[in-house]
């Protein structure tokens, strides 16, 4: 899972992820938006559920983050739309709407994001 951090012209941090993990970058860009308290919450949840059968979920405005002791799932909330609501011939490009990755890999991105934020 490759990633890149960039600053836009306003100084805001943007995350770009490798193919297949784009939605993780969207989660950082749309839900985190430099809110380190949210990252604290995610890291605390990861510590709490590690080695257990429990899971944790955070539903955001655009994306939902779900994790258990082994993997993290990020999915666009729009995926809740049933097929009946879609126009004929239309479908979602799911690669940018859903992603799975390991908890440790995800936490590495969180750590790198924090470090990049401190470089202001």
UniProtKB/Swiss-Prot annotation:
Pfam families: UPF0231. InterPro entries: UPF0231. It comes from the Bacteria. Disulfide bonds: none annotated. Belongs to the UPF0231 family. This is UPF0231 protein Ent638_0667. It comes from Enterobacter sp. (strain 638).
């Amino acid at each position: 899972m490759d990633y890149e951090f960039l600053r836009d012209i306003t100084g805001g941090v943007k995350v770009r992820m490798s193919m297949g993990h784009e939605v993780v970058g969207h989660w950082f860009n749309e839900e985190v938006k430099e809110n380190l308290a949210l990252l604290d919450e995610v890291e605390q949840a990861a510590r709490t559920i590690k080695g257990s059968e429990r899971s944790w979920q955070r539903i955001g405005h655009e994306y939902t983050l779900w994790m258990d002791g082994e993997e993290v799932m990020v999915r666009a909330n729009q995926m809740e739309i049933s097929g009946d609501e879609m126009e004929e011939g239309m479908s979602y490009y799911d690669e940018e709407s859903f992603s799975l990755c390991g908890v440790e890999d995800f936490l590495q991105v969180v750590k790198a994001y924090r470090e990049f934020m401190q470089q202001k």
